[in-house]
A protein has these predicted regions:
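Amphipathic alpha-helical recognition patches that constitute DNA-binding helices
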Residues: 1, 23, 45
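Short hydrophobic/aromatic-rich motifs at helix boundaries and adjacent loops
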Residues: 1, 14-15, 33-35
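Enriched for short, Lys/Arg-rich terminal
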Residues: 8-22, 40, 53-62, 66-83
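Short, well-structured alpha-helical segments
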Residues: 21, 25-29
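A short, surface-exposed loop/turn module that caps and links secondary-structure elements
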Residues: 29-56
Length: 83
């Protein structure tokens, strides 16, 4: 599941940088296989945003998400913890 901003970032990578898109897809697979707190991309809880976590896409971009027992919601997949 994506927020509107998260989905717009995802669409951006589809047209601008296939390598980054592949990394995002790899991180999403890792979340679904290993859980939201384990796996690739150095998962970490965001201190300034309660209930949100991030993983490194690359040195400049982060995958920001939140999760419940049933759903993972991608809030952003570009930038560095942006609103």
């Amino acid at each position: 599941m994506f927020t509107e901003i998260g989905f717009s970032h995802y669409i951006y990578w589809q047209t601008q940088d296939k390598k980054t898109l592949q990394k995002i897809n790899k991180l999403l697979k890792s979340i679904s296989r290993e859980g939201p707190l384990e796996g690739e991309g150095k998962p970490e809880r965001l201190k300034h945003k309660e209930g949100e976590y991030s993983r490194r896409i690359d040195s400049e971009n982060r995958l920001v998400y939140e999760f419940s027992e049933e759903t993972i919601t991608v809030k952003a997949c570009g930038g560095h913890y942006e609103e």
